[in-house]
């Protein structure tokens, strides 16, 4: 299954995506937790700060009101110059303060003279000394500031009360202290109603560690808790208390601590919820991506698989195949170049097949002509041998006549008989000469035809050699394309290796392209070797045809010379026959003209010797011609064999 390129791409993309998802989930988990923790801290800090500002703002409003009362002219006049009018105005003032704010439990003044004035009116013991009370002492110690006492529970109402005090000064001398008893219920309600995220809550504690506001432990003192002691000693901060995140801040000069608390597990619950949501989203995206990558890989590798099938068909010799691709990427370019290569190969093989057919036909014709020429030359050689034999015999007889010319008178009858024999043999020689001329004419005609066919074959071989050179150039171009494709695939593999894991899919595609280029290179090499073999055999055949042409030229020259000799022999034989006839007619006068006869016989002897020599030369030329014809025949057979092998090679291709 993993031998398929599209499966490799799909599996590779899936593995990379799984690794990416795992890394993203791990990164999300590792980064989300501190981010959520930090966000929780920031949120609760903002809540705590807002709560602290609201409480401080409320306390400050009471401090401003109390400062106005303590520093007011009415209060100063009431304390330093008491009168009914001053008392009335002062009481109206504090009454208005009390009536306008339900959280002011009581407004009052204690003087240095140990007098006590309150609203609402309250009864005090006769020995009650306001200057001995904590609220008075604190204000007297810091006359320029509003001071706050520790909160306490009202014994009558049960409400938590805090007293704010401000010294009344006269020439920088404390003459009294103005105070408000404030109900903390408003602040407690504000704290208890404060919404804190992550299922948290707000709390308020005084400087002694008493919880003024808390959803479950209100009124409890937590000053003995070591962790909370750290909170009490610092102005503000964040503490992790038993898995609870506590954010706290000090309120102004009161020393109170307002804070918020939430469970850190709630932060992790949100983180886990987000991680689970991310996990499901990642799984769905992973499945969709795997499916899409599978079909994308099929889309990419489909044209390559088609091209592999077409390449195998071409390597098997089928040049009718064509690959289809409408894309304009590298695969599309490779497909179009493949189709162009197959088309060019088809045209070249077709041309080679046609040329091979012509060469084969011409070779057969040349073989037939060579066979006929060889047979005719054999007949000529036989005739020339007969002529040579007759000429030799004639020379011998003439020599005998010459030797016995002295006894011609006594052997006239024998001379007459011999003359008759000479006449008959002369006729035979004349007939043989005419036959030799006819045979020589046939030989010349066949030799010319053979020469013409040889020229045609030589021309065709040159054309074939040029065609094979064209094939070799195209094959070289194809080989260069394969080498370039292989080099590009190698470069793509190097670039993919540089890209690391993200480039591994491109490395696999590049490796497949490189293998395809190597297969094309092997096929091209096989074609190149076949073409080189054809070129070698064509060159050998061409050289043989050139040699045959040269031999034909020499043969034609020898035939012309033989024809001239035969014409001479024929003419001489005609003269010889006429002479013999004359001898035969004048035999009765031979004795009277013996000297003339002797001279004539010597002349005949010389001519006979020349005829014998010419016949031997013709015979030798004929033998050479036979050898040449054998070579021509052998060359044509070699050419025919090479043409047949070429046809068999071309037959492997389907056009």
From Swiss-Prot:
Gene3D superfamilies: HAMP domain in histidine kinase, Methyl-accepting chemotaxis protein, PAS domain. It is a multi-pass membrane protein. The keyword Nuclease does not apply. InterPro entries: dCache_1, HAMP_dom, MCPsignal_dom, Sensor-like_sf. Keywords: Cell membrane, Chemotaxis, Membrane, Methylation, Transducer, Transmembrane, Transmembrane helix. The keyword Cell membrane applies. Coiled coil: none annotated. GO terms for cellular component: membrane raft; plasma membrane. Induction: Induced by SigD. Expression increases in the late-exponential growth-phase and is maximal during the early-stationary phase. Residues 30-276 are extracellular. Pfam families: dCache_1, HAMP, MCPsignal. Some glutamine residues are deamidated to glutamate by CheD and subsequently methylated. Its main location: membrane. PROSITE patterns: CHEMOTAXIS_TRANSDUC_2, HAMP. It is found in: Cell membrane; Membrane raft. The chain crosses the membrane at residues 9-29, 277-297. Interacts with FloT. Belongs to the methyl-accepting chemotaxis (MCP) protein family. Chemotactic-signal transducers respond to changes in the concentration of attractants and repellents in the environment, transduce a signal from the outside to the inside of the cell, and facilitate sensory adaptation through the variation of the level of methylation. All amino acids serve as attractants in B.subtilis, they appear to cause an increase in the turnover methyl groups, leading to methylation of an unidentified acceptor, while repellents have been shown to cause a decrease in methyl group turnover. The methyl groups are added by a methyltransferase and removed by a methylesterase. This is Methyl-accepting chemotaxis protein McpC. It comes from Bacillus subtilis (strain 168).
């Amino acid at each position: 299954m993993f031998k398929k390129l599209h499966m490799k791409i799909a599996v590779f993309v899936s593995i990379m995506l799984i690794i990416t998802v795992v890394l993203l989930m791990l990164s999300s988990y590792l980064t989300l937790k501190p981010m959520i923790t930090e966000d929780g801290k920031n949120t609760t800090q903002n809540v705590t700060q807002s709560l602290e500002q609201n409480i401080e703002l409320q306390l400050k409003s009471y401090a401003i009101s109390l400062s106005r009362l303590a520093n007011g002219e009415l209060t100063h006049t009431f304390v330093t110059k008491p009168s009914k009018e001053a008392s009335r105005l002062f009481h109206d003032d504090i009454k208005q303060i009390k009536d306008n704010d339900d959280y002011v439990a009581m407004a009052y003044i204690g003087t240095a003279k140990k007098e006590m004035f309150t609203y609402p009116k309250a009864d005090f013991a006769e020995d009650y000394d306001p200057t001995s009370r904590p609220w008075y002492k604190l204000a007297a110690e810091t006359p320029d500031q509003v001071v706050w006492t520790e909160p306490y529970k009202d014994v009558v109402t049960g409400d938590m009360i805090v007293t704010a005090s401000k010294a009344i000064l006269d020439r920088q001398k404390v003459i009294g202290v103005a105070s408000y008893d404030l109900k903390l219920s408003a602040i407690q309600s504000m704290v208890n109603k404060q919404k804190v995220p992550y299922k948290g809550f707000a709390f308020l504690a005084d400087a002694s560690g008493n919880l003024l506001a808390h959803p479950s432990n209100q009124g409890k003192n937590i000053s003995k808790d070591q962790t909370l002691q750290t909170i009490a000693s610092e102005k503000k901060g964040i503490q992790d208390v038993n898995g609870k995140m506590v954010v706290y801040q000090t309120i102004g000069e009161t020393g109170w601590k307002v804070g918020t608390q939430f469970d850190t597990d709630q932060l992790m619950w949100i983180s886990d919820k987000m991680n689970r949501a991310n996990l499901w989203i990642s799984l769905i995206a992973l499945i969709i991506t795997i499916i899409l990558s599978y079909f994308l890989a099929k889309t990419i590798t489909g044209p390559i698989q088609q091209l592999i099938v077409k390449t195998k068909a071409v390597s098997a010799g089928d040049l009718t195949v064509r690959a289809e691709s409408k894309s304009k990427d590298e695969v599309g370019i490779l497909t179009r170049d493949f189709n162009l290569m197959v088309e060019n190969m088809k045209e070249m093989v077709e041309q080679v097949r046609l040329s091979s057919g012509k060469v084969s036909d011409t070779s057969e014709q040349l073989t037939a002509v060579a066979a006929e020429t060889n047979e005719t030359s054999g007949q000529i050689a036989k005739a020339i041998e007969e002529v040579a034999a007759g000429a030799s015999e004639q020379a011998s007889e003439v020599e005998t006549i010459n030797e016995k010319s002295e006894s011609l008178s006594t052997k006239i009858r024998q001379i007459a008989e011999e003359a008759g024999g000479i006449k008959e043999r002369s006729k035979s020689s004349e007939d043989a000469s005419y036959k030799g001329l006819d045979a020589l004419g046939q030989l010349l005609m066949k030799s010319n035809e053979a020469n013409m066919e040889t020229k045609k074959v030589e021309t065709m071989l040159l054309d074939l050699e040029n065609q094979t050179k064209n094939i070799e150039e195209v094959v070289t171009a194809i080989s260069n394309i394969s080498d370039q494709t292989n080099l590009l695939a190698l470069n793509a593999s190097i670039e993919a290796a540089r890209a690391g894991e993200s480039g591994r899919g491109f490395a696999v595609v590049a490796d497949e392209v490189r293998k395809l280029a190597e297969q094309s290179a092997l096929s091209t090499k096989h074609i190149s070797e076949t073409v080189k073999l054809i070129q070698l055999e064509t060159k050998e055949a061409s050289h043989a045809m050139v040699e045959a042409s040269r031999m034909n030229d020499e043969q034609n020259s020898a035939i012309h010379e033989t024809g001239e000799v035969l014409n001479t022999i024929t003419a001489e034989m005609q003269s010889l026959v006429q002479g013999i006839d004359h001898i035969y007619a004048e035999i009765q006068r031979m004795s009277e003209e013996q000297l003339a006869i002797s001279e004539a016989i010597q002349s005949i002897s010389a001519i006979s010797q020349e005829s014998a020599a010419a016949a031997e030369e013709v015979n030798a030329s004929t033998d050479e011609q036979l050898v040449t014809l054998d070579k021509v025949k052998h060359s044509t057979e070699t050419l025919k064999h090479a043409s047949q092998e070429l046809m068999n090679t071309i037959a492997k291709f389907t056009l």
